[in-house]
Amino acid sequence: LYGKYAFNNSDIHQDEIEISGHNSGFESGIIATQLLHKTALSATVSFEKAIDNNSNKFPDAQAASAINYSLSCGKLMLPKDYSSFKQTNMNAMIELLGQTLPQNGKSYFDIAPAIQFIFNSQARIDAGYRFQLLSSMNRTAPQGFLLRFEYLLFNPFENRN
């Protein structure tokens, strides 16, 4: 399970609901992942709700909620022989992503191939490109590059005596 809340001050000018960049609002969802040998499969479904962007009111004529879904597959390319969590991993990934606005039926469907590097099982760098396959909604960025860095803090409050 996951959830996030975001604030944004920009004007609202697209059908797509995206609290990680364009909308204020919240998102809650569930992620299921299965590791099969050197391949990881992951599915996500979430509910996303947009609200006013500070003084920029959400348009009454636009759908304010969305159902998001994704399916991804990642394959460990290197190292060939995995022996330790400290090894650097290189993964090839492909992700299918979509959003549907239940209030008006508009939707999009994208594909996003990427390369991922994982260092010491704690730091992650993803580089990829997202392509729009189908869409019936107005979107600001239907395609584009992705560069992401994540760093996990394992037990940051653990007493280390």
Regions found by a protein language model. Name each.
Residues S10-Q14, D52-N56, Y82, Q103-K106, ...:
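Outer-membrane beta-barrel proteins
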Residues L71-C73, P142-N161:
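Outer-membrane beta-barrel "beta-signal"
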Residues G3-D11, L36, F47-I51, K75-M77, ...:
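Transmembrane beta-strands of outer-membrane beta-barrel pores
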